[in-house]
Amino acid sequence: LQYVTLYGIFYAYEIIFYSGGIILEKLVITGPTPLKGEVEISGAKNAAVALLPATLLIDGVCTITNVPNISDVQILCKILGEMGAKIDWTGKNELKIDTTNITTTQAPLDLTSKFRASYYLIGAMLGRTGKIEVGMPGGCNLGARPIDQHIKGFELLGANVEVGKGTISAKASCLKGAHIYMDVVSVGATINIILASVLAKGTTTIDNAAKEPHIVDVANFLNTMGADIRGAGTDVIKINGVEKLHGNATYSVVPDQ
């Protein structure tokens, strides 16, 4: 039995070893001991990695605060930079992003293949230009971690999606609103369909949508820039397409949960 005092609280924890490895770790907390003080809560990673691609939909500059400076965010910044965006860290956790001059519809394949959330570039670029190619997000196995709900949503909006050897490409001459029923509740697909629908013609309804806080955060961010998204945080989300999103706004990433 091991003992430790942390922030004025007495902890006892027991580690049981079996065959040379730890199979169980147990914490026993003895209280009450009053707590006091402050901690800084970082911005939510799952929101940040969706908000950065969402800036591709904006006509202008935006500032995002409370951005966690983690590897996935750093890779996304590099991807957006190589696509033509101007990105500056203007504070400890503050990014100024200008996506006015995006110069390519092919995201760096080597970088997008490094982490799964790069698939948000597909929805955002379909909305912006109607065309995008990325490396297979995170090197994911389509059987083990399917993105079929993403593809289903894009195709119902009017896009043609092709999965190649290590790449995904999508293009559409005109995205049009549609009713999309999610066969499986998917956070990533819900956000991706929102991104693709914001500038589409007409109304898109996502039925059986995921309801996580970072979905609400993405919707709030886009609405701040002029989108018309309703119902985020419920299982039915409606997106009324608008002509464009404006920049010149500041938004803070929701704190981590």
What residue spans do the PLM features occupy?
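Structural preference for solvent-exposed beta-strand-turn elements
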Residues: 2-257
